[in-house]
Structures are given as C-alpha cells and as structure tokens.
Amino acid sequence: MSSIRLYNTLTRKKEPFEPLEPNKVKMYVCGPTVYNYIHIGNARAAIVFDTIRRYLEFRGYDVTYVSNFTDVDDKLIKAARELGESVPAIAERFIEAYFEDIQALGCKKADIHPRVTENIDTIIEFIQALIDKGYAYEVDGDVYYRTRKFREYGKLSHQSIDELQAGARIEIGEKKDDPLDFALWKAAKEGEICWDSPWGKGRPGWHIECSAMARKYLGDTIDIHAGGQDLTFPHHENEIAQSEALTGKPFAKYWLHNGYLNINNEKMSKSLGNFVLVHDIIREIDPQVLRFFMLSVHYRHPINYSEELLESARRGLERLKTAYSNLQHRLQASTNLTDNDEEWVSRIADIRASFIREMDDDFNTANGIAVLFELAKQANLYLQEKTTSEKVIHAFLREFEQLADVLGLTLKQDELLDEEIEALIQKRNEARKNRDFALADRIRDELRAKNIILEDTPQGTRWKRG
C-alpha cells in the first residue's frame, strides 16, 4: 500500500492513494478556455497539479497526464466577433501564449493536450450513446442531459436534487424539460462556428467535452481528476453524471480541487479591476517567485495574493538559492573525506525522509518548503566547519536539486557578466539616492544570492565574486 494519502472531494476525507493499476497513474486536469491570456488563478491550478504530477513521478509512478483546451465556446465566439477574427485564430494564439506562460512558471507540458475541435466526432458519439440510453433528449437541434435520471447527481458537491431544484431556472429561449437539465449540444446560431451532427449543425456544450476526451485518452475510469474548486459544481458534477450514465463505472477514483485565489483579500474579478494576467506579472517578477508563492500555501486552502506576500516569497527563494550557491562555491576548496562525513550524510537522509513524509500527506508543499529551509539551515551550519568534504557537499547539492525539482524550482543561477553586475550596482546607487532602500536592499540580496559581495566605501561601491 502506498504511504501517500490524499483528500478526495468525493468522500470529503483523506484516503490512501491506490491507483487502479499498480505504479501507473491516469490523471486528467481541466485546462483553460483559450479566449485570453491565463490569469493567476489559472496559474495556481497549473502549478499545483504539475507539482502533484512531479511528486508522483518522484515516488516512482508512471503518470499519464492529460489536460484539455476548450477551443470553442461562447467566450471564444464573443471574442472573435469583437476582434473581427476567426475562433480558430484566437484559440491558436492563446494556446501558444498558454504554453509560453506555463513554461515560464516551470510547468511541464501534459502528455496529451486534446482540443475540443479535434474531438468533435468522439463527442457526438458520446452524446448519441446517452440519447440511446435515455439519459439525453433532443429539442429543435439542442440536446440536453436528463439530470434527474442519474440518481447520484449531487454526490461530488454534496447537494441534493431538492436543494439544486430550488435555485434552478429555465432561461428565455431554452426548451429543456427540466430546469436542472443541461446542454450537451447547442444548435448553431447564424454566423457561429459549427459542425454537422445527427441533430443538425451546432457545437458541443462545455461539460460533455471533458467526459468524452477523458474517456478517449484515459479509459472509462481514471485515477485522478483535478481542477479548481470553482469547477466542482456544476462542471465536475455534470462530468460524473454523463460518464457514469454511459459506462456504468466510476468516472474517477480521486477528485482533487485547489482552493481559491484572492487579491489583497478580495475575490479576483474583472468588475473589481483586480484581474492579474500571468502574461503581465511575469514581466515584472521572476516567474519562479510566483511559483514559490503558490506552493507556500497548502493547495486546498485559499491563498491571498499581495505585494507583501510576493516579496516574502522572493526572500524565501533567495535564501534557498544562496545556500545552494554557497555550497557550489565551497566545492573546489573541499577535501576528499573528513571525520564526520557519515553523520552529515545521515542528517541529509533524515531531511529527505521528512520531505517525503510531508508531501505524502496530501501533497503538503507548504511543509515541503519548510523542509527545504531546514536543508538550507543545515548546509549553512556545515559550511561553518573548518574543513568540508566533497562527499557531503555533493550530497547537499544533490538533495537540493532533487527536492527543488519536485516543486518545479530551479536553484542553479547563471553567472552574471561584469557589465550586468555594474548595471545592477548603478541601479542600486540610484535607488539609495532616491531613498528607495527597499529596492536597494533587494538588489543587494539578489547579487549576494549569485555570490557577488558588495562593499560600500567612501569612494563608491566595490564588488567581488565570493
């Protein structure tokens, strides 16, 4: 039995992780609707589930990771109309932008990134099968899911049909039998992108896309289905209803959801004007700092985005990079062996075990980062020894690299050119002149992390490589 325990939204408790097939994990993560650049809420989901994938691979699992693109949707059609472009052109542009953003954030590409428009036939077959089983019906070119027929509806979001009924309404123009029913196929309106189907020209509804693509690429039952907390209902609830009605099997064994992201203690929304796009923010800050920030809170908890917390994350990452850099620079001056090598190697092994213990407990990256800080503390203590050995230094470096890689963090730093150092010193001098001491300190810390030591003298600032 695996020592990993994860919180399952379906059961509302932590459970031992036992994939359907030993050592193999089938994982589906709901991807973006590509009508704009992704915002930092999307980035949190991308970073969180990339890290969970990395950790499962670190623990020896063979992970097949699928994350979709919704490349046809009401929002895309609206954007195309406003910009005077085609839906495929807009989708293609923002898919490319998505890959650029997540790569900057240290996220690996999924094994498969299916697009809705490349899977229309699969979706149509799925819908037809639901009609054949009595779970869906067609009205004037629209196809709806018969929600009440699926008796377990509400089991993921822990709501009863009666509770859901109270808030359900039929919109003007909808012809469904029941307010709880939802669209599987939408009849085309004039000028909209559409495909031929047994019910006339149209396009898929949102919920059916993920059910059809998850089944096509991962089978009837998958190990982990994941996404943002806001997708629990109705999206994931509807996916379960569709998939389990068709196959008669559980759709996913474990459901994982990351918590909300707030901006300065307010919900992020366009109406409040606090919408932060990854495309913009990574031009202002190191993307690794944003990733570190996202992982500094447990993935299920809400996280508050603010300048102060980003600055705290920057300092934390700098501490780790400085410890790693100091080890690298000490390597050349180290001997082959010292008397207490085994004691230090044992300490490092204990720290690795602590990291695994924390991450095994529902992927607790916040505590995992705390363990990395302990590794940095022990490394700094070791470097105070009169003599150091290559064996121990290598053990520290290897542990830093492996554990940081699980979190998608890179501690190695490219060496600065002399002119780059001089430019940063000039920028620091200007900041001090303008009494912007926070910026001056930040530049000094960044240089120190890259092993550049500054000395302020009456004649000006001198520097040397440590």
From Swiss-Prot:
UniProt short sequence motif 'KMSKS' region, positions renumbered to this chain: 267-271
Protein's GO biological process: cysteinyl-tRNA aminoacylation
GO cellular component, one term: cytosol
Domain of life: Bacteria
Motif ('HIGH' region): 32-42
Modified positions (Phosphoserine) in chain numbering: 271
Binding site for ATP: 270
Protein name as it appears in the record: Cysteine--tRNA ligase
Organism: Geobacillus kaustophilus (strain HTA426)
Upper taxonomic lineage: Bacteria, Bacillati, Bacillota, Bacilli, Bacillales
